[in-house]
Amino acid sequence: MGYNVFYFDLEDEMNSAKKLRRFIKPGETVLVTFNFEGLEKEAGVYREGIGYVWDEYAVPCYNIAVDHPYYYHERLADLPEKYYHISIDRLHEAYFKHFYPEFMHRGFLPLAGSRLEELCKLNTGKEEGKQSVEYPAERIRKPVEKKYNVIMTGNFTPTSFCEPYIHWINDEYAAFYQGIIDDIIAHPHRTVEEVALEHCEREMGENTYKDLRMALHRMIFIDIYVRNYWRREAVKVLVDAGIQVDVFGKGWDELTCGHPENMILHP
């Protein structure tokens, strides 16, 4: 599109910061980042008592948040004045708008790899004098030879990792947390926040959105537990049925299954 792009090297913050200041043009430059990189008070862009370089030069900050907002509760404190949040999931978008109304939300951006045919209307004609963009349909894509039949991408954490967090307060809270976990696993079509909020309301009555967003942040171990429970079960049922699965990610060597020879580990 013709824009100059500056890549900030987080492994060389101080040198990058010097170059960044020379690159910034107030009123023109914007920050585009993922998962709050450059917005966590890094040494090169933040100085105690002064603040962010983004505020110093009035740079708009567009943050593309990949994970669920309840993972970011603490990061959503003390951000630059011109902070704009972008979600990659429709449910994340709805959650953020409801529980963090004090922030400017800039909508939804699909991840790379999403089928644009499902997100955009095909239009090969002219509209208001401009040629619209045509996205290739599935049927006209050239077939490619597959190297792997079944792939699992993502890290694996045994559910035992979450046990200390389930029991971190007392037995009453542990039963509360375990009840949420069991409910989500029994009803996989429901989201973590949907079930957790239902249990919170049942146990504690109505609460403010600020209280609830803090409570959900403190229950992110439930998300980790359920996510890895289903990852474990999905891979186990396949490899134990004799299907070879190529897994890409950390922690899969800790998976216990009947036929580990069918699970091919990749770094």
Region locations from a protein language model:
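Nucleotide-sugar donor-binding catalytic core of glycosyltransferases
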Residues: 1, 102-267
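Extended catalytic core of nucleotide-activated donor transferases of GT-like folds
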Residues: 1-99, 117-120, 134-139, 264-267
